[in-house]
């Protein structure tokens, strides 16, 4: 499977820097990496999607076309920008914003009906990991049971919560074992990404694992040259 790289800016990128970053990436991305790169700015960091060489996506959207949902971004907003790729289930939204499994299912089903490409994030906390691999498998299985694993526009991103933003990536052995388990559950055509303290120093080794189809990168993607270094390993 062709390997891909995704950048999640979270809420860390200044608005106009985000705009300049997108335009520079479009100009400088090498042909061998066309269509293998995805970028998820915050909503104000988005631009109307006229980019030809990479995919522009949204970090979040409310599962309605439009309406009285103060502060929310809806499918109509994204469609107006010609954006049809969306992150769902990121641990920061699960934990900080209390997005429940039932709400994540509602989001998934709604944007599936719109034929969006959905990047669905899963991952366990350290307390689960410390209970052993059986507990990890049960936890991840539960996170996936409410969505359609045969949806052809699905990408799954495994991000162990204890590795996100901690500068401590999961070990290569942990990634190998966990991705091997997830590959048994997922449709064979569904890309499976790793995320969690990915950077330019460890990306190449992680991409060397056969069951890793790409990377979801947070803070290491905020500087374009860092992100381009990671892209070069694809």
UniProtKB/Swiss-Prot annotation:
Pathway: Carbohydrate biosynthesis; gluconeogenesis; Carbohydrate degradation; glycolysis; D-glyceraldehyde 3-phosphate from glycerone phosphate: step 1/1
Compartments where found: Cytoplasm
Any one GO biological process: glycerol catabolic process
GO MF, any single term: triose-phosphate isomerase activity
Binding site for substrate: 8-10, 165, 197
Protein purpose: Involved in the gluconeogenesis. Catalyzes stereospecifically the conversion of dihydroxyacetone phosphate (DHAP) to D-glyceraldehyde-3-phosphate (G3P).
Name of the protein this chain belongs to: Triosephosphate isomerase
Organism of provenance: Helicobacter pylori (strain Shi470)
Species lineage: Bacteria, Pseudomonadati, Campylobacterota, Epsilonproteobacteria, Campylobacterales
Name of the gene this protein is made from: tpiA
């Amino acid at each position: 499977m062709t390997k891909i790289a995704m950048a999640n800016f979270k809420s860390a990128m200044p608005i106009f820097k985000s705009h300049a970053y997108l335009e520079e990436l479009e100009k400088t991305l090498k042909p061998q990496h066309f269509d293998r790169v995805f970028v998820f700015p915050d909503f104000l960091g988005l631009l109307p999607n006229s980019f030809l060489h990479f995919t522009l996506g949204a970090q979040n959207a409310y599962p309605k076309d439009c309406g009285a949902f103060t502060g929310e971004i809806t499918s109509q907003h994204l469609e107006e920008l010609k954006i049809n790729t969306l992150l769902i289930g990121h641990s920061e939204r699960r934990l900080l914003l209390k997005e429940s499994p039932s709400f994540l299912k509602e989001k998934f089903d709604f944007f599936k009906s719109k034929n969006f490409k959905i990047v669905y994030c899963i991952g366990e906390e350290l307390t689960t990991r410390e209970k052993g691999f059986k507990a990890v498998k049960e936890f991840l299985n539960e996170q996936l049971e409410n969505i359609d694993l045969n949806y052809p526009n699905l990408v799954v991103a495994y991000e162990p919560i204890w590795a996100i933003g901690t500068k401590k990536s999961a070990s290569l052995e942990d990634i190998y074992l966990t991705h091997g388990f997830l590959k048994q559950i997922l449709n064979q055509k569904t890309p499976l990404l790793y995320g969690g303290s990915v950077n330019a120093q460890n990306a190449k080794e992680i991409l060397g694992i056969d069951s890793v189809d790409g990377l979801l990168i947070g803070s290491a993607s905020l500087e374009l040259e860092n992100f381009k270094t990671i892209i070069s390993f694809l």
